[in-house]
């Protein structure tokens, strides 16, 4: 891997991506408020399809790296003439155990990569099939924040995309304990499955709107995070996953008639502040560069390719309070 590069223009580049977008009407349900981020005009940068679409159409194949497998790594083979975007935190299910992506990767046409992952099912190490499928989930944002922060530390210390696997397992265990969910393999997916009705209620309140490319999310009126993708169609395929990842930690909360909501001014202030965050750049395992951004307890990472921010996920202070 190439040496870390500190670039003063990377944080402003992410902030500029947001400034080029418009915002939709605020949507609120329970303690959560969502502001849709809308892309205007033709998208710039590389064209690609989402992981969900690629797996559905047989464009890529994801397997263990060998017959025996290796927990922190998977093999991705792009069988198509289209680029494929895999998002930080997206879960793949099957093979010897379920895993999530440790960082966002844009896989080139007809390319084959070894990608870094974290285990989200520590009670299973046996085959359910040779290939992985889309679990239709992104890990809970609090867990993703902790994982992403540990990956950023690994990049700075030894230039690897390794996560704190023990921390990921502990966070998943805490989710099971919170909801009293049962799972003989300690699978993260089982929490989502067993809370399906409550999650669906939130998803229905936060529909994807025309031209949407992202969300800014508030909890109890305070900013919890933001996620954006550079193209509308891939975002549409990921929207429900993203909404669930913000909501899963809050299903124990009662729905009150009067809840604090977010505001467009608060969203713009936080997004504008990204311009001044500390940023570090690393060579991505796929196309482009992996950007790591931090400002106090706020943290984010982005994929830069063809001078375009293809994906950005940012975590605000409130994500840790959930």
Regions found by a protein language model. Give the residues of each.
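Short, surface-exposed beta-strand-loop junctions and turns on beta-sheet-rich folds
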Residues: 82-83, 92-94, 232-233
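Long, low-complexity, serine/threonine/proline-rich intrinsically disordered regulatory regions
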Residues: 2-17, 25, 151-322
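Glycine-centered loop/turn motifs
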Residues: 71, 87-90
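Asparagine-centered strand-capping/turn motif at beta-strand->loop junctions
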Residues: 73-84
């Amino acid at each position: 891997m190439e040496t870390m590069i500190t670039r003063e223009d990377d944080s402003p580049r992410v902030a500029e991506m947001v400034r080029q977008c418009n915002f939709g009407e605020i949507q609120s349900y329970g303690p959560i408020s969502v502001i849709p981020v809308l892309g205007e005009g033709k998208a710039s940068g590389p064209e690609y399809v989402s992981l969900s679409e690629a797996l559905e159409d047989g464009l890529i194949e994801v397997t263990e790296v060998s017959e025996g497998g290796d927990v922190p790594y998977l093999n991705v083979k792009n069988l198509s003439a289209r680029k494929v975007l895999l998002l930080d935190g997206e879960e793949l299910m099957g093979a010897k155990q379920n895993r999530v992506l440790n960082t966002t990767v844009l896989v080139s046409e007809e390319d084959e990569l070894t990608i870094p992952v974290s285990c989200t099912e520590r009670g299973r190490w046996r085959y359910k099939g040779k290939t992985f499928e889309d679990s239709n989930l992104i890990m809970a944002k609090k867990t993703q924040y902790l994982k992403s922060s540990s990956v950023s530390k690994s990049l700075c210390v030894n230039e690897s995309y390794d996560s704190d696997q023990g921390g990921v397992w502990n966070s998943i265990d805490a989710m099971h304990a919170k909801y009293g969910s049962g799972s003989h393999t300690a699978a993260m997916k089982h929490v989502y499955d067993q809370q399906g009705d409550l999650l669906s209620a939130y998803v229905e309140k936060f529909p994807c709107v025309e031209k949407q490319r992202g969300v800014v999310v508030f909890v109890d009126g305070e900013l919890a995070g933001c996620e954006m993708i550079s193209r509308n169609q891939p975002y549409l395929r990921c929207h429900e996953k993203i909404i669930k990842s913000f909501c899963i930690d809050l299903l124990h909360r009662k729905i009150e008639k009067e809840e604090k909501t977010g505001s467009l001014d608060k969203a713009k202030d936080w997004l504008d502040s990204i311009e001044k965050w500390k940023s570090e750049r690393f060579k991505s395992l796929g196309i482009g560069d992996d950007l790591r951004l931090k400002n106090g307890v706020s943290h984010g990472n982005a994929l830069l390719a063809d001078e375009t921010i293809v994906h950005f996920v940012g975590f605000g202070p409130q994500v840790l309070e959930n």
